[in-house]
Amino acid sequence: MLAPKKTKFRKMQKGRLRGPALRGASIDFGEIGIKALEHGKLTSQQIESARIAIMRHIKRGGKVWIRVFPDRVRTEKPAEVRQGKGKGSPVGWFAPVKPGRVLYEIKGVDIETAKEALTRAQHKLPIKTKIVVKEGL
């Protein structure tokens, strides 16, 4: 699973996702990709699951870029514990995603194969997404 090697602090504030993605909104590396249509949080397991779905469909051909990285920690308090007494323990990592953010890119396979692979990856993600093709193809 994806996770940062080292962080400055064990826990962090929750924060808010507001507005569209200012960076990472265009296809820069591949020819076709998946773009987020709504706010959400992608866990490292969801990112990896979608990557595996893409790789299994395109087999050995082509290259895949993952454009998001889970660098925010998710904390949880144990079940049946009263509120208060501090923040819960870290349990996993997630990537905050804003609308317009490109999540995955593919290059080196024909468009139909890439579209089918990305459609399979879309089913693994908890947010609405669309398939976008780089302009000029």
From Swiss-Prot:
Keywords: Ribonucleoprotein, Ribosomal protein, RNA-binding, rRNA-binding, tRNA-binding. It comes from the Bacteria. PROSITE patterns: RIBOSOMAL_L16_1 (PS00586). One of its GO terms (biological process) is translation. One of its GO terms (molecular function) is rRNA binding. GO terms for cellular component: cytosolic large ribosomal subunit. InterPro entries: Ribosomal_uL16, Ribosomal_uL16_bact-type, Ribosomal_uL16_CS, Ribosomal_uL16_dom, Ribosomal_uL16_sf. Gene3D superfamilies: Ribosomal protein L10e/L16. Belongs to the universal ribosomal protein uL16 family. Binds 23S rRNA and is also seen to make contacts with the A and possibly P site tRNAs. HAMAP family: Ribosomal_uL16. Part of the 50S ribosomal subunit. This is Large ribosomal subunit protein uL16. It comes from Solidesulfovibrio magneticus (strain ATCC 700980 / DSM 13731 / RS-1) (Desulfovibrio magneticus).
